[in-house]
């Protein structure tokens, strides 16, 4: 009977694959997998399933006896994939049959070089989901997302591009040069394709692109011993351990602050103002974006898009580029030199000092005329407005956690307190992230999670890998989908998508997974919370960004809304405390 069911399922899937002309993924438990493998061996028919050709995409093992969602523990599962008649499978990668096998090797090299799979991966490794990696590669390249090596993907492999990875290892956010200090650069060995003067002028013009829209200023220096950005041309191995590949392919690469150096492949034919060769100005402006702290963009019209699109005589920065650079350095206020910006800071300090003296009286009046506090003044570290986690309970009360403390963000009855006193004495001092799922509240810290019911029944801490296999420690934020039961975890620049059965389905850069992602969120978020059935709020650096959950689209791009003001409004004591702190700092600076 079991064999009959398996045959029926296999034949049905094969027919459905033919009708839809698309691959289909199926999950079998270990017992069924043994049966179907035996069946294939006995009959000599693989029924269109790719497993006999080593196309196993993902194997997940989980033993979770504490499944509090009411579901059963997940068995060892193997995901199999059917293919259409026009596709073949090579080492775990589904390939259109008219694609040369050499492209498979090149695709794997690209996926490694640009951060989609670990370096040194072996073809067909069961723990590497090449389909997911290809989907991300296609999404960042702005082409159709099929998850297979098709003609469009093969063409993208041959497109000249920047050598900086699309997916960088985890780095802390906000990497940038200090504001109000000119960024210095120097010239090293230059190309012989053009005159030295012409090359330097184009490179200066590339810096000016970023100067025009931000508060940045640049200064050219001759001594390269202590310069911020060193510029040079070189071929193949050129001294930084990241070799160029000859003409075509990688055109240049650069390093993020506080290195910032930019290198250009001297094997390219660099040109100025012509469609032939490779336009020096456009490539340099892109690389200097990296030198200033920008990552790649999946917006095809953006300068920071990783692929070279040819000479554009009407070049302008895209809105996405401007949002990125101003999120790091602020907008150009009209000042053109570092020295003209410094007096602005002094004037601001003076004005704020005067204002603070006035509002100090208001804060004093507030404690006697508006609403007497029923709780003591919060400690200063609880008034920063920087949250570790945000959670909404079953009564629709929203709590923001900051270190040892929490805020209840409620216009009618705002309050604060110690996290352990409100949520449980067995919680750690610092919670990384949290979310609500039915009657359960989940809290994450380090490599462990804690959970309790709405009746305050608590469960012991549990390692991540008991429930979410593949989730890294020290996550930044988490939320659970309202309809599908999917859970999204955030760590650095990545979002980890887990199915309702807690299987890792995908790891993607935040910027490529959500639509219209604000630049401030591309290298990480502080917290996420569902505020109602429509919107999620993403918190970062004193601001929150609203996203429609059903479409995964941000709606107040690019600047967000301030939640520092929310704290000031809801918690009068915090506002009073912060004002007194600022008065003290202003008084000290004026002495």
Swiss-Prot record:
Active site positions, chain numbering: 287
Marked site (Cleavage) residue numbers: 450-451, 503-504
Residues the record marks as carrying a glycan: 129, 144, 578, 588
Disulfide bonds: 383-586
Residue positions binding Zn(2+): 162, 286, 290, 296
Low complexity composition bias: residue spans: 336-348, 356-372
Annotated Hemopexin repeat ranges: 384-419, 428-471, 472-517, 522-574
The protein's required cofactors: Zn(2+)
GO biological process: collagen catabolic process; extracellular matrix organization; proteolysis
GO molecular function: metalloendopeptidase activity; zinc ion binding
Enzyme Commission number(s): 3.4.24.12
Domain of life of the native organism: Eukaryota
Region (Disordered): 333-379
Signal sequence annotation: 1-18
Family of this protein: Belongs to the peptidase M10A family.
Cited function: Allows the sea urchin to digest the protective envelope derived from the egg extracellular matrix; thus allowing the sea urchin to swim freely.
Record's comment describing the protein's domains: There are two distinct domains in this protein; the catalytic N-terminal, and the C-terminal which is involved in substrate specificity.
Protein name: 50 kDa hatching enzyme
Organism listed in the record: Hemicentrotus pulcherrimus (Sea urchin)
């Amino acid at each position: 009977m079991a064999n009959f069911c398996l045959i029926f399922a296999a034949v049905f899937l094969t027919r459905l694959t033919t009708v839809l002309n698309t691959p289909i993924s199926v999950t079998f438990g270990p017992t069924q997998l043994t049966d179907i493998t035996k069946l294939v061996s006995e009959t000599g028919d693989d029924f269109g399933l790719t497993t006999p050709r080593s196309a196993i995409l993902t194997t997940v093992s989980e033993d979770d006896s504490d499944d509090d969602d009411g579901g059963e523990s997940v068995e060892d599962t193997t995901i199999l994939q059917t293919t259409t008649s026009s596709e073949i499978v090579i080492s775990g990668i589904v390939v259109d049959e008219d694609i040369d096998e050499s492209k498979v090797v090149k695709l794997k090299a690209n996926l490694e070089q640009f951060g989609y799979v670990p370096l040194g991966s072996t073809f067909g490794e069961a723990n590497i989901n090449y389909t997911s990696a290809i989907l991300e590669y296609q999404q960042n390249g702005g082409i159709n997302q099929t998850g297979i090596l098709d003609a469009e993907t093969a063409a993208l492999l041959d497109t000249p591009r920047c050598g900086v990875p699309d997916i960088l290892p985890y780095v802390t956010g906000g990497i940038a040069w200090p504001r109000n200090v000119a960024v210095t650069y120097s010239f090293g060995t230059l190309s012989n394709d053009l005159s030295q003067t012409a090359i330097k002028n184009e490179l200066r013009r590339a810096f000016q692109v970023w100067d025009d829209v931000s508060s940045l200023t640049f200064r050219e220096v001759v001594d390269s011993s202590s310069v911020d950005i060193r510029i040079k041309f070189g071929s193949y191995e050129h001294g930084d351990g990241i070799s160029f590949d000859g003409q075509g392919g990688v055109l240049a690469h650069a390093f993020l602050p506080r290195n910032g150096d930019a290198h250009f492949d001297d094997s390219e034919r660099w040109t100025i103002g012509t469609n032939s060769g490779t336009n020096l100005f456009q490539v340099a402006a892109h690389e200097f974006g990296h030198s200033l702290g920008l990552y790649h963009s999946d917006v095809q019209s953006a300068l920071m898009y990783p692929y070279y699109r040819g000479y554009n005589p009407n070049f302008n920065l895209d809105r996405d580029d401007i949002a990125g650079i101003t999120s790091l350095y602020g907008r150009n206020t009209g000042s053109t030199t570092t020295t003209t910006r410094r007096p602005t800071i002094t004037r601001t300090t003076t004005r704020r000092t005067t204002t603070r003296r006035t509002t100090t009286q208001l804060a004093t009046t507030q404690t006697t005329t508006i609403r007497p506090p029923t709780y003591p003044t919060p400690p200063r570290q609880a008034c920063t407005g920087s949250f570790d986690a945000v959670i909404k309970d079953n009564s629709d009360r929203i709590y923001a956690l900051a270190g040892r403390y929490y805020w209840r963000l409620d216009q009618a009855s705002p309050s604060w307190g110690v996290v352990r006193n409100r949520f449980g004495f067995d919680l750690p001092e610092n919670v990384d992230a949290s979310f609500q799922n039915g009657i359960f509240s989940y809290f994450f810290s380090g490599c462990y999670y804690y959970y309790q019911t709405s009746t305050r029944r608590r469960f012991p801490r549990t390692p991540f890998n008991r429930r979410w296999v593949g989730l890294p420690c020290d996550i930044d934020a988490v939320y659970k989908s309202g309809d599908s039961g999917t859970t999204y975890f955030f760590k650095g620049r990545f979002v980890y998508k887990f199915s309702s059965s807690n299987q890792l389905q995908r790891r993607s850069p935040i910027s490529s997974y959500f639509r219209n992602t604000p630049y401030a969120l591309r290298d990480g978020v502080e917290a996420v919370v569902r505020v109602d059935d429509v919107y999620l709020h993403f918190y970062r650096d004193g601001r929150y960004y609203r996203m429609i959950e059903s479409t995964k689209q941000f709606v107040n791009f690019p600047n967000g809304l301030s939640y520092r003001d929310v704290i000031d409004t809801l918690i009068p004591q915090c506002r009073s405390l912060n004002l007194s702190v600022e008065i003290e700092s202003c008084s000290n600076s004026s002495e």
